Swiss-Prot record:
Cu(2+) 2 binds at residues 69-71. Residues 53-93 have a biased composition (Gly residues). Residues 51-92 are annotated as: 5 X 8 AA tandem repeats of P-H-G-G-G-W-G-Q. GO terms for biological process: cellular response to amyloid-beta; cellular response to copper ion; cellular response to xenobiotic stimulus; intracellular signal transduction; learning or memory; negative regulation of activated T cell proliferation; negative regulation of amyloid-beta formation; negative regulation of apoptotic process. The lineage of its organism: Eukaryota, Metazoa, Chordata, Craniata, Vertebrata. Monomer and homodimer. Has a tendency to aggregate into amyloid fibrils containing a cross-beta spine, formed by a steric zipper of superposed beta-strands. Soluble oligomers may represent an intermediate stage on the path to fibril formation. Copper binding may promote oligomerization. Interacts with GRB2, APP, ERI3/PRNPIP and SYN1. Mislocalized cytosolically exposed PrP interacts with MGRN1; this interaction alters MGRN1 subcellular location and causes lysosomal enlargement. Interacts with KIAA1191. This is Major prion protein. Cu(2+) 1 binds at residues 61-63. One of its GO terms (molecular function) is cuprous ion binding. It comes from Oryctolagus cuniculus. Residues 23-229 are annotated as: Interaction with GRB2, ERI3 and SYN1. The normal, monomeric form has a mainly alpha-helical structure. The disease-associated, protease-resistant form forms amyloid fibrils containing a cross-beta spine, formed by a steric zipper of superposed beta-strands. Disease mutations may favor intermolecular contacts via short beta strands, and may thereby trigger oligomerization.
Length: 252
């Protein structure tokens, strides 16, 4: 890791040194009294790169005779007769659009639901709600339960509740806690809606949630490892020296 940091430092020092020298070189032409024309309307030996825009006689910015900025006769900025800045009859731009329904407002319930995944759920003692998952394909060892699961999988949760992985000593502890809280919350919510779960439902739901909790643990463990690796990389002395040097070049 240290050798890699030193090589990165040497590479960026060489690159930014060349960039710093380039910044100090004067730019030819284009300035005041430097011989170049910075404005398209002025003649130059090479011709005009930006020819003047417009339409027919007396048309500034295109349009018919006497039309500023295009549009019909007597229309400033385009639109129908008597329409300033376009719009329907008697409409001043986008204001006072008579007779048009207002735009639908975004439901705050939808916004809250979209931001729920990965956030701490209030009232559950620090548990977070995971992202939605596809329900796993599980074989339960007999045709009846396999068929029952296929026909009723929509009744089972597709998200799990969990705490951060650093609060557990191993995967089994995480999964056990995750299954218990998820099954409990889903059962209470479903019962409140007037539905009931049978013993078969509970058995199948525990298996399904267990697989989802294992997946959640793997995702959280990988994310925690990547965060730790990033902190370790940026805390190494060569990288700190490199960042300090880059800041010096940018500011200077």
């Amino acid at each position: 890791m240290a050798h890699l940091g030193y090589w990165m430092l040497l590479l960026f020092v060489a690159t930014w040194s060349d960039v710093g020298l380039c910044k100090k070189r004067p730019k030819p032409g284009g300035g005041w009294n430097t011989g170049g024309s910075r404005y398209p309307g002025q003649s130059s030996p090479g011709g005009n790169r930006y020819p003047p825009q417009g339409g027919g006689w007396g048309q500034p910015h295109g349009g018919g005779w006497g039309q500023p900025h295009g549009g019909g006769w007597g229309q400033p900025h385009g639109g129908g007769w008597g329409q300033p800045h376009g719009g329907g009859w008697g409409q001043g731009g986008t204001h006072n659009q008579w007779g048009k329904p207002s735009k639908p407002k975004t439901s705050m319930k939808h916004v809250a639901g979209a931001a729920a995944a990965g956030a701490v759920v209030g009232g559950l003692g620090g548990y977070m709600l995971g992202s939605a998952m596809s329900r796993p394909l599980i074989h339960f060892g007999n045709d009846y339960e396999d068929r029952y699961y296929r026909e009723n999988m929509y009744r089972y949760p597709n998200q799990v509740y969990y705490r951060p992985v650093d609060q557990y000593s191993n995967q089994n502890s995480f999964v056990h806690d995750c299954v218990n809280i998820t099954v409990k919350q889903h059962t209470v919510t479903t019962t409140t809606k007037g539905e009931n779960f049978t013993e078969t439902d509970i058995k199948i739901m525990e298996r399904v949630v267990e697989q989802m909790c294992i997946t959640q643990y793997q995702q959280e463990s990988q994310a925690a490892y990547q965060r730790a690796a990033g902190v370790l990389l940026f805390s190494s002395p060569p990288v700190i020296l490199l960042i300090s040097f880059l800041i010096f070049l940018i500011v200077g």
